[in-house]
Amino acid sequence: MANGIASAIQPGDEIVLSIMEHHSNIVPWHFLRERYGAVLKWVDVDETGALDMAALEAALSNKTKMVAVTHMSNVLGTVTDAAEIARLARAVGAEVLLDGCQSGVHMDVDVQALDCDYYVLTGHKIYGPTGIGALYGKAEALARLRPFQGGGEMIEIVERERVTYNEA
């Protein structure tokens, strides 16, 4: 996901993460920080282990491009209020990515009710091989993603001056 939005990131653009994130939802955003000048902002949990929603709201600004948070913590088991996270993010024009690696296998998930732009999960949590996963995205959100690798069946036409990509 971070690679998919990288071309839209300008120095000073913000990515908001929670302190509950698995490193797989931290390291890619650090790449954007290192390579493109993105600013990572961190939101803590409250005394119950829930995402501190007041701190989340305070962390958001008109420079926030992405709120990337766990839907269910792999350490605490906390389920975040994804619909409220989306509402707050929308108020500043930010997109929402939910890490569904835990929730996708432990609870019923309705991505439309959650109103997230993207929902990701890993294949090994559903007895698939390591290194694969699934991505849900709203059509308009997926259309904003840019390819970060090329080849094979993703290419429609290759010419000297341009490349046309197949529909996702």
Stretches with model-predicted labels:
Residues M1-A168:
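Pyridoxal 5′-phosphate
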